[in-house]
Amino acid sequence: LTPRPVRPAYLGVLGRIAPEKGVDRAIRIAARCGIPIKIAAKVDRADQDYYDELIRPLIENNPLVEYVGEIGDREKSDFLSGAIGLLVPIDWPEPFGLVMIEAMACGTPVIAYNRGSVPEIVDDGLTGFVVEDEISAVAAVDRLADLDRGQIRKVFERRFTARRMALDYLAAYRGLMEEAEPRVRLVSSAE
């Protein structure tokens, strides 16, 4: 994923519509800010009732909300580059939020609830904001313009590329090899 030369114009939600993902909270955050929100997400069969009962009523006849459905990798760069920020108002301990890293790859800041891996991924005040609730998320939206999208991309390149991961693995293996004692010890030379 790479940044696209577009003018950001909406808040974004990417991924899956499920209670723990907080799409209803994202819609309320955008509404409180008076900013349009685009939701690019799938609805799994198990979450259909949540969508029908809670999300659909928030979307229908709401000019600020656009539900675009599930998108593929080809559309993600455009979607994320067009977002002022990505909202991730989760209420479960997300082990690793890939959508946050995808946003950062496009230079898009992230506003995410302080759950699970969020504080390890989002550098508060640099790549986005780690927040506690809807009120602090609304306040963070007002500060998104202060963040440098080019710097967000640089942080992604420094921390989350496949090359970075491979180098980290090599360093870990080297460290383990240096710490390990040899399994075979020579008592004396054969000469």
Predicted regions and their residues:
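A short, well-ordered alpha-helix in the C-terminal region of glycosyltransferases
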Residues: 146-168, 175
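Short hydrophobic beta-strand element within catalytic cores of glycosyltransferases
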Residues: 105, 109-112, 122
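Conserved donor-binding/catalytic core segment of Leloir-type glycosyltransferases
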Residues: 1-40
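Nucleotide-activated donor-binding/catalytic signature segment of Leloir-type glycosyltransferases, i.e.
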Residues: 39-41, 52-74
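Acidic donor-binding loop of glycosyltransferase active sites
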Residues: 81-95, 108
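Short alpha-helical donor nucleotide-sugar binding micro-motif in glycosyltransferases
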Residues: 70, 78-83, 169
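Short glycine/serine-rich donor-binding loops of glycosyltransferases
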Residues: 97-100, 118
